[in-house]
């Protein structure tokens, strides 16, 4: 962290930067000052898809690890997003991981009473086939949100990121995410010394991506992992 890095915490000493923190993400967010975060990532553990699709294999086989994670209902997700809206800087970005169920059924109500605007989306091709009653799941979706005022110039500095991203990942967590994609997005939307936030860190891929981006500062937590 360089000398110009902004102090973002209301109370210092509760959380460590550039490392794992085992803590409730809402507690972490409540200790962060308004308009201090350049870029945030949010990957909720969706209860909705398990309730609606009812594959019948909850707690069985490869689904055990996923279902053992703390689930988030819609009200919890909305609370997180409102807090993220509060701490993100004007024209800063929130990268929201979303599954096909919520992409198709709708998620814009989560953004009500915020200053967050949908500006783009990336499809992550995971390179392997998952579950599905009809088509088999092979991708996830990253909704790109920008806090008002919306602008690209000066706020998005890389122009080599395609809207379909191929990257296989090592399964170190039920919600493992592509480190290189996240690294590129961090480089595109932050300057040296700025903060990258992930309040539901899971396998801490955003931490790894931030460290690889260099000269950025990670702050994040997970309720189960730290």
What residue spans do the PLM features occupy?
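Core catalytic lobe of class I
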Residues: 1-221, 225
């Amino acid at each position: 962290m360089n000398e110009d890095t902004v102090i973002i915490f209301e109370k210092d000493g509760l959380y460590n930067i550039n490392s794992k923190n085992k803590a409730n993400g809402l507690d972490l967010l409540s200790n962060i000052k308004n308009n201090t975060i350049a870029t945030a990532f949010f990957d909720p553990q969706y209860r909705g898809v398990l309730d609606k699709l009812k594959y019948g294999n909850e707690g069985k086989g490869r689904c055990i690890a996923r279902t053992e994670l703390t689930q988030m209902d819609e009200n919890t997700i909305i609370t997180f997003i409102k807090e993220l809206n509060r701490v993100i800087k004007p024209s800063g970005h929130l990268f929201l991981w979303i599954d096909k169920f919520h992409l198709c059924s709708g998620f814009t109500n989560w953004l009500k009473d915020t200053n967050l605007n949908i500006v783009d989306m990336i499809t992550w091709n995971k390179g392997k086939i998952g579950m599905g009653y009809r088509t088999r799941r092979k991708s996830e979706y990253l909704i790109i949100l920008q806090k008002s005022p919306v602008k690209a110039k000066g706020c998005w500095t890389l122009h080599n990121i395609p809207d379909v991203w191929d990257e296989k990942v090592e399964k170190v967590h039920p919600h493992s995410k592509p480190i290189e994609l996240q690294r590129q997005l961090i480089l595109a939307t932050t300057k040296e010394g700025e903060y990258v936030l992930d309040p539901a860190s899971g396998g801490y891929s955003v931490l790894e991506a931030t460290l690889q981006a260099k000269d950025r500062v990670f702050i994040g937590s997970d309720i189960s992992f730290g």
